[in-house]
Amino acid sequence: MGNGNSREAKESRRSRLRHKLQKFRIHRRHLRSSRNSAGMVIQRTVSAEDFSGIALLTLIGAEMKFKDKWLACVSFGEQTFRTEISDTTQKPIWNSEKKLLLEKNGPSLARVSVFETNRVARNKIIGYCELDIFDFVVQEPESTCKSFNLLDPTSSNVVGSIFLSCAIEDPVETERRFAKRILSIVDYNEDGQLSFSEFSDLIKAFGNLVAANKKEELFKAADLNGDGVVTIDELAALLALQQEQEPIINNCPVCGEALQVSDKLNAMIHMTLCFDEGTGNQVMTGGFLTDRQASYGWMFKLSEWTHLSTYDVGLNTGSSASYIVVIDRKSKRLVEELIDSKIVLSMRAIYQSKIGLRLMDQGAKEILQRLSEKQGKKMSSVESAQKIPRFLEFFKDQINMAEVKYPLQHFKTFNEFFIRELKPGARPIACMNRNDVAVCAADCRLMAFQSVEDSTRFWIKGKKFSIRGLLGKNVNPNAFLDGSLVIFRLAPQDYHRFHVPVSGVIEQFVDVSGSLYTVNPIAVNSKYCNVFTENKRTVAIISTAEFGKVAFVAIGATMVGSINFVRKEGEHVKKGDELGYFSFGGSTVICVFEKDAIGIDNDLLVNSGRSLETLVSVGMQLGVSTRTFARSTLI
């Protein structure tokens, strides 16, 4: 009797699964009817934000204004790919392609950069364009090839055109192609369908013991017409349904890699790309983080050959390499921050060694102080204006002069240019009518932590760092102990005016004397140096209704001439209002919130947890008051 009940239960499960598969196949047929012969959706009702799938981006060629050897790079999310170098020509042809993963709430903005490669020292970016891959999802392309203007990174002048195509493979087609490739592994007689024996071998390859014990049940459920074999469509429906309900694939049947069962989309994409035979076009070389790194050429061929990861993100990167990689919040792609290699070697020698810091204690601090003051005066001289064009050239693709309030000839000294104002509206303020939403205080590289403990674990390595030490002796630190901490690091190329992150009243300004160490991550990540608690700084306390008190700490750094505030004690300020500016040099602002006063945006916390700085602009959302939310739930 027990065996009978077992058989009935098994038949019942099989019947339910078969019924679900039939409904699933009807839904798939409906979706397939909306595709053309190329597998593209003709009428897309899905929104870009909800779409997940694969985009095949092909860089066909370009038309430039002079002859050279050219290469192109595509940056998308945390990956960058590059083409081969063309022959010397004005019209390079690459025909290079790469499959990009589109995820819900993932990156969608791709940046294509074109470099000239005739220089021995470093390839030079000539032009770039940005395109939203999701535009190809919601719009039917008018032709297989589109032309985009290439813009000069500094002037936004058109310097050429690039020709590319982007084909979006909808999820149903991806499932079917995936099933076809999966089926081919064990289709021993190559008849395009699976017998029970072949199906059993496939289930074994998936590495799921539970599924292997139910292979007969799964086979009968998949074989909807009862002809004793499973077709491509039947297998696709089974795999799609099971991956949604009870995943049966634990290991990739191609490479054997263990798959994350919780990440169904990436598991399918991983296996799809493992099976990929390509289209015959040249596949772009990957393994890079930024377009600048990808453009270096021969170094990366060597690094790939030796299977070494030359570039990476995180804490060790910032403290030990001649570059800093940050993630752009807007485009969700990685970008490289330029630092002169000689400066990097000097900073490492000083800040990453006990000997260097001992020199600091024996008078080098005073030398840095005098050097910074001297350099500040020099940058305020009329002669210093001659340095502006060279500065713009060095940071060619990182300063947008179209945003600047005045034309270049307006600036009579380098410092006037350094503290340049922006045009009204250049930095929109998030949720302007909501005082419970805090915003970013500067154009900067940002690190955010819900607690001081997190900040010292992931980023600040100075042994003596504390909130009490940061605020100085003349500010009562009790309200801020165990509070949230946000670090806004401004690089030389950034807009150097800082703004109010919250609306409230400025209670007081307190000057704290100190040294002028660099605020570069090379120093911040040093266990021998206490940058934030030893540098010259000014503390502003802002009293708010939504966040309680907020400490706004403006910290000077090497080469910073002065910290200037444009507001006064007792003045009411709105978030986004200009609060002050730094003269020439790198500099940092730190905001400290009271404990449990703010819920910092998750993407900022996730990046900071990876020791990865986020590139943000003034006015971007920083977080939301938790106290306002708590009050609203009590009412």
From Swiss-Prot:
The modification Pyruvic acid (Ser) is found at S587. One of its GO terms (cellular component) is plant-type vacuole membrane. Its EC number is 4.1.1.65. Ca(2+) 2 binds at D223, N225, D227, E234. Its cofactor is pyruvate. Pathway: Phospholipid metabolism; phosphatidylethanolamine biosynthesis; phosphatidylethanolamine from CDP-diacylglycerol: step 2/2. Transmembrane segments: none annotated. Binds 1 pyruvoyl group covalently per subunit. It is an enzyme of class 4 (lyase). Is synthesized initially as an inactive proenzyme. Formation of the active enzyme involves a self-maturation process in which the active site pyruvoyl group is generated from an internal serine residue via an autocatalytic post-translational modification. Two non-identical subunits are generated from the proenzyme in this reaction, and the pyruvate is formed at the N-terminus of the alpha chain, which is derived from the carboxyl end of the proenzyme. Keywords: Calcium, Decarboxylase, Lipid biosynthesis, Lipid metabolism, Lyase, Membrane, Metal-binding, Phospholipid biosynthesis, Phospholipid metabolism, Pyruvate, Repeat, Vacuole, Zymogen. One of its GO terms (molecular function) is phosphatidylserine decarboxylase activity. Heterodimer of a large membrane-associated beta subunit and a small pyruvoyl-containing alpha subunit. Belongs to the phosphatidylserine decarboxylase family. PSD-B subfamily. Eukaryotic type II sub-subfamily. This is Phosphatidylserine decarboxylase proenzyme 2. It comes from Arabidopsis thaliana.
